[in-house]
């Protein structure tokens, strides 16, 4: 058995998350200074919330969310997607490779006016949602509406 075993895995993970948080704070500062997003209400709290969510699903701390992390994120949000849908979503959001997307891509997606990924999620949600049947007595019909 090795004598040089590192028993501080939690400490190393904490340092990794602290470094990641510093990097994301720098990116948040860039978005706060960007005039494109200056009209957004409560931008600081939105960015903080997005940072927390991003850190929750960027488990390896490399700064990118891959397809499996996105799948887990959407499942946790109650919007599970197929592998093909996820690939399309990442392709639309990603500014670089088609396999992952970065934190700035994530912020542009979330802060954009009805972004592509949000539109796709809403579209799939509408398709999945069944029309509710009206309850109560049927509405009265006029003679002209009868067959």
From Swiss-Prot:
Q: Binding residues for Ca(2+) 1, per the UniProt record?
A: 58, 60, 62, 64
Full protein name: Allograft inflammatory factor 1
| Residues bearing PTM N-acetylserine | 2
- Using the record's annotations, give every residue carrying the modification Phosphoserine: 39
Q: What domain of life does the UniProt record list for this protein's source? A: Eukaryota
Biological process terms from the Gene Ontology for this record are: actin crosslink formation; actin filament bundle assembly; actin filament polymerization; cellular response to oxidative stress; cellular response to type II interferon; inflammatory response; negative regulation of smooth muscle cell chemotaxis; negative regulation of smooth muscle cell proliferation
**Phylogenetic classification of the source organism:** Eukaryota, Metazoa, Chordata, Craniata, Vertebrata
- Species of the source: Macaca mulatta
Residues with the N6-acetyllysine modification: 11
């Amino acid at each position: 058995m090795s004598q040089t075993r590192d028993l501080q895995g939690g400490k190393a993970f904490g340092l990794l998350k602290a470094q990641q948080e510093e990097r994301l704070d720098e990116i948040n500062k860039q978005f706060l200074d960007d005039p494109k997003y200056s009209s957004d209400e409560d931008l600081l709290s939105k960015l903080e919330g997005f940072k927390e969510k991003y850190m929750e699903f960027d488990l390896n701390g490399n700064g990118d969310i891959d397809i499996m992390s996105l799948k887990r994120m959407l499942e946790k949000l109650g919007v599970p997607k197929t592998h093909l849908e996820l690939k399309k979503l990442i392709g639309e959001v990603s500014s670089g490779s088609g396999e992952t997307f970065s934190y700035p891509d994530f912020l542009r997606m979330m802060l954009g006016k009805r972004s592509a990924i949000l539109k796709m999620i809403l579209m799939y949600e509408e398709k999945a949602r069944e029309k509710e049947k009206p309850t109560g007595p049927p509405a009265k019909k006029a003679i002209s509406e009868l067959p």
